[in-house]
Amino acid sequence: MAKLTKKQKALQGKVDSTKLYAFADAVVLVKEAATAKFDESIDVAVQLGIDAKKSDQVVRGAVVLPNGTGKTTRVAVFAQGAKAEEAKAAGADVVGMDDLAAQVKAGDMPFDVVIAAPDAMRVVGTLGQILGPRGLMPNPKVGTVTPDVATAVKNAKAGQVQFRVDKAGIIHSTIGRRSFDNDKLQGNLVALIEALNKAKPATSKGLYLRKVAVSSTMGVGVRVDTQSISA
């Protein structure tokens, strides 16, 4: 574990772990603690009121953050014919079929998102053991297996993030960078929370959004009052 700087230790002492902070105040604290020389990611962790062990309570989906992620997303598309041309026109970085599969098998994967047209899944299906562990396997639940490859590419490039609850019932996601102003970060968080609410399992009982915490890549985490999260 990396050692905390004197400034981070001082800020850590200012954060009351038992207190819920308004989002605007939480972001101020998180940005003060983001002392790395690079533009740190601002991340959120959302504890959901679900039982992640039950298959009907697995929360998964995707949402386009209105203010982007601050990251350049490289997109690969498995498609052929007209769909391949549509993907290229939409800005895909790599487009192919068997040739792209061979590239993946060789370990050459300079991309962050993989999209597939439905008729390409016969090829993509053979790559599950490679793409799956890297979180790159296309899935219709997050819109990466779709006949509308052009829109999928545009969404990925525009700042779409995928989310999936972990075994502890927590969703982890970025909402931008330290360089983003607070309004942009809040707008992105609102979009994420709205997407999580839409993905709420029908079998989930009680309080759904239990805890929200915001942090930077190298900084301390601050708990957020969910009532303060609004557009």
Swiss-Prot record:
Belongs to the universal ribosomal protein uL1 family. One of its GO terms (biological process) is translation. Binds directly to 23S rRNA. The L1 stalk is quite mobile in the ribosome, and is involved in E site tRNA release. Pfam families: Ribosomal_L1. It comes from the Bacteria. Keywords: Repressor, Ribonucleoprotein, Ribosomal protein, RNA-binding, rRNA-binding, Translation regulation, tRNA-binding. InterPro entries: Ribosom_uL1_bac-type, Ribosomal_uL1, Ribosomal_uL1-like, Ribosomal_uL1/biogenesis, Ribosomal_uL1_3-a/b-sand, Ribosomal_uL1_CS. Gene3D superfamilies: 3.30.190.20, 3.40.50.790. The keyword Transmembrane does not apply. It comes from Paracidovorax citrulli (strain AAC00-1). HAMAP family: Ribosomal_uL1_B. This is Large ribosomal subunit protein uL1. GO terms for molecular function: rRNA binding; structural constituent of ribosome; tRNA binding. GO terms for cellular component: cytosolic large ribosomal subunit. The keyword Repressor applies. Part of the 50S ribosomal subunit.
